[in-house]
A protein has these predicted regions:
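N-terminal secretory signal peptides that target proteins for export/translocation
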Residues: 1-18
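C-terminal motif of bacterial Sec signal peptides marking the signal peptidase cleavage site
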Residues: 32-35
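Catalytic-loop region of hydrolases
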Residues: 41-123, 127, 135-141, 147-149, ...
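Cap/lid segment of the alpha/beta-hydrolase catalytic domain
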Residues: 130-206, 252-253, 260, 404-428, ...
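Alpha/beta-hydrolase fold nucleophile elbow
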Residues: 207-218
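Glycine-rich nucleophile elbow surrounding the catalytic serine of serine-hydrolase chemistry
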Residues: 216-226
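A catalytic-pocket lid/entrance helix-loop region that shapes and gates access to the active site
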Residues: 226-228, 233-343, 486, 503-506
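Short beta-strand/loop motif that positions the catalytic acidic residue
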Residues: 448-450
């Protein structure tokens, strides 16, 4: 597989950066479809999931009648439905009618519920929200379930769906000094929206759904794990993609370190050191050194933890006048800092579970590095997404702290930053408690997935969470209800050079409804017309896909399960205690 042309990369990156804080919201609403391809070798196909004995159910009342439904028992006084009308959406080229219900759950949780007028298969899916949320994704747009070209349950309007803005409007956290809005964003908004959707379903169809699912990516992945931890009976199956479960760490130390590493002055007053063109130079060198681990020349790194690439290996010779194909000493230092992450100055202990991994460099553009080339320098680090998400989340993370730190005063080299600034809101905002015993007991199924080339959230945090689950509950118990998939070359909630089209909806429905646990899941690359150009299986962690050695390596049929390439547990780091069991905190109006 050839590398993407640099012009295409930079154009794509500019488009990503243009959406700034809204980027993650877009990613999260795409999750359910990003989980809809066709089944592959050793996997459960979409058609298998469709064989579940669930009859199509038709409405028993007119859509307009739902406008009169009282939802104050769920959201409290002031909760109201504002409209209930039949709308038409284009799904897979066909027109599909939905009873679209809009409303507000007090004090300010705006929601939309989409109920298929025909073809409902007794399934419900709540859709996660990304970034700092603040907008309601249109749940009638089944095409927003990206990559659903072979998932008939989604394409044919088989799911009732719901989405919420989680209690506020806008992508910053200016609202976050309000304790109730903190709670609505942290955990309450999705839960009460689900209860409302279920009430509407029961009224509209004359019966409850048979199966309920939650699908989210990024913050939507955090919301997914929050549901499993706090409301274990809400969903039969949960898909948590690239979860920002460590919300506070992610939006302070993690992204803040990217800014500090990039700055010519070491703080937010400086300009960027590493630019888009040099990120591509770095990426080419990394994949040349570490790509092809699966036995084919595809430029993908099957497990970046085995890649010991040193940026100094491509440092420009002293006195070089043309540095377009090498890194300057300053650029080498910046890249090394981004990979290495911060450490405690006294103990040498790492401050983070992980950083952006080798092979993710192309995806740094617009996040860790500017969208422009080094010839367009200087660009202030305040233009980076990493800076914007950190400063946008100040109020949400540090309200109630002894002082309000800034991106320049975070304890990047002082482990006491965790108990001093992040511990207080940890049980409220984070979703890192590894004890999912109640969810397991309720029969729930969980699929975690993460792209190895994620530019926003290091996959090592997700590995840390999965390992914590195994250490807390026992590996055999975890295997009974949870799987984790790590996808080489795939960026944050999709994209990248890898195989981003992955069918997880059929996997979770088959597991929850038929008891068929997922194993190999086929992933796909497609062209601009959405035609499949290559396929490859991905296996439950820690196994990797390995080319069989015969046939076309672009065909997933010629791949098998390989042994893990890396067998060490996640290193101890300053925030490791955040991944031990704790009692979730609540505040404000209690959720039903």
């Amino acid at each position: 597989m050839s590398h993407l042309h640099s012009k295409r990369i930079f154009a794509s990156a500019r488009a990503r950066a243009a959406s700034l804080l809204g980027l993650l919201a877009v990613c999260a609403t795409a999750t359910l479809v990003a989980a809809c391809g066709s089944g592959g070798s050793g996997s459960t196909s979409s058609s298998d999931a469709a064989k579940a004995p669930l009859a199509v159910v038709t409405p028993v009342v007119d859509c307009s009648k739902l406008a009169a439904i009282d939802i104050t028992d769920i959201g409290g006084a002031g909760s109201t439905i504002t409209s209930a009308t039949v709308t038409t959406a284009t799904v897979n080229g066909a027109s599909v009618n939905f009873c679209t219900v809009k409303g507000t759950l007090a004090p300010s949780n705006t929601f939309e519920v989409a109920l298929p007028v025909s073809g409902w298969t007794q399934r419900f899916a709540a859709l996660g929200c990304g970034g700092l949320c603040g907008n309601v994704s249109d749940p009638t747009q089944q095409s927003s379930f990206s990559f659903s070209y072979t998932c008939p349950l989604v394409q044919q309007g088989g799911f009732a769906t719901a989405a919420t803005d989680m209690g506020h409007s806008g992508n910053d956290a200016s609202w976050a000094t309000d304790p109730q809005k903190q709670a609505d964003f942290a955990y309450r908004g999705q839960h009460i929206t689900t209860l409302t959707a279920e009430k509407l379903i029961k009224t509209y169809y004359g019966q409850a759904q048979k199966y309920a699912y939650f699908v989210g990516c990024s913050d939507g992945g955090r919301e997914a794990l929050m549901a499993a931890q706090r409301y274990p009976n809400d969903y039969n199956g949960i898909i948590a993609g690239a979860p920002a479960a460590h919300f506070q760490i992610q939006n302070s130390l993690y992204h803040g370190w990217s800014v500090k590493s990039q700055s010519t002055t070491g703080d937010s007053t400086g300009n960027a050191v590493l630019y888009a063109d040099k990120a591509l130079v770095l990426h080419k060198a990394v994949v040349a050194a570490c790509g092809g681990q699966a036995g084919v020349p595809d430029g993908l790194i099957a497990d970046p933890r085995t890649c010991n690439f040193d940026p100094a290996s491509i440092q420009c010779p002293q006195g070089a006048t043309n540095t377009s194909s090498c890194l300057t000493a300053a650029e080498v230092a910046t890249a090394s800092k981004i990979y290495g992450g911060p450490v405690d100055a006294t103990t040498g202990e790492r401050m983070l579970a992980g950083s952006p991994q080798p092979g993710s460099e192309e995806n740094w553009v617009g996040v860790e590095v500017p969208t422009t080339n080094s010839t367009d320098a200087p660009v202030p680090v305040t233009k980076l997404f990493s800076y914007m998400i950190v400063t946008g989340a100040y109020n949400l993370i540090f309200t109630g702290s002894p002082t309000m730190p800034t991106i320049d005063t975070f304890g990047y080299t002082d482990a006491s930053f965790y108990p001093t600034y992040l511990q207080a809101n940890h049980p409220l905002m984070d979703a890192t408690s590894p004890d999912l015993s109640a969810f397991h007991k309720a029969g729930g199924k969980l699929i975690l997935w993460h792209g190895w080339a994620d530019q926003h959230i290091s996959p090592l945090f997700t590995i840390q969470y999965f390992e914590a689950m195994q250490n807390t509950m026992g590996a055999s118990n975890v295997s009974d209800f949870a799987r984790m998939y790590l996808v080489p070359g795939v960026g944050h909630c999709g994209g990248g050079e890898g195989f981003p089209n992955i069918d997880l909806v059929s996997q979770i429905t088959a597991w929850a409804e038929q008891g068929t646990a997922p194993n190999a899941v086929m992933t796909y690359q497609t062209d601009s017309s959405n035609n499949v150009t290559a396929s490859r299986p991905v296996y439950p962690y820690p196994a990797v896909a390995q080319f069989s050695g015969t046939g076309d390596w672009h065909s997933g049929a010629n791949w098998t399960q390989g042994s893990p390439l890396y067998n060490e547990p996640t290193h101890t780091w300053a925030g490791s205690s955040f991944y031990t069991s704790y009692s979730p905190a609540t505040q404000g109006v209690a959720a039903p």
